[in-house]
UniProtKB/Swiss-Prot annotation:
This is I. Residues 57-100, 143-171 are annotated as: Disordered. Belongs to the Orthorubulavirus I protein family. It comes from Mumps virus genotype N (strain L-Zagreb vaccine) (MuV). Residues 151-162 have a biased composition (Basic and acidic residues).
Amino acid sequence: MDQFIKQDETGDLIETGMNVANHFLSAPIQGTNSLSKATIIPGVAPVLIGNPEQKNIQYPTASHQGSKSKGRGSGAKPIIVSSSEGGTGGTQIPEPLFAQTGQGGVVTTVYQDPTIQPTGSYRSVELAKIGKERMINRFVEKPRTSTPVTEFKRGGGRERLPKARQSKRRA
């Protein structure tokens, strides 16, 4: 058996591969079927401006904006903390890291106000902060309260064994 590919076989393989690549490059791309998504949100991926799907994106006009689906809302929905959960009741807290689209398709992010202390349903957030703090401080070198053992010997040392045990070991 010949384990090596000959020079002419290598040329044939490269030519076949190039023919396959040229076939797929010359084939027409049918709009949104190539990404398996309906459309690309304008402004999210400015790198993809020259993509084949760009010509098939339909931008909403003024007549279509009123008929948005109820599944998605535009803008951040604030979370209202009720007075039964404790703390100050009725205060609005913006949902942390909620991405929303502004004008012109620019994506902006709303962050939670750091001055508002989490209460009620945010107790888990506070516990997570404490857990993170403990994990970070866990491996920090702290001063020792006890003196370290300096006379540790591997194997136990035979010179300190009682005479009864030494006689058993020799046997």
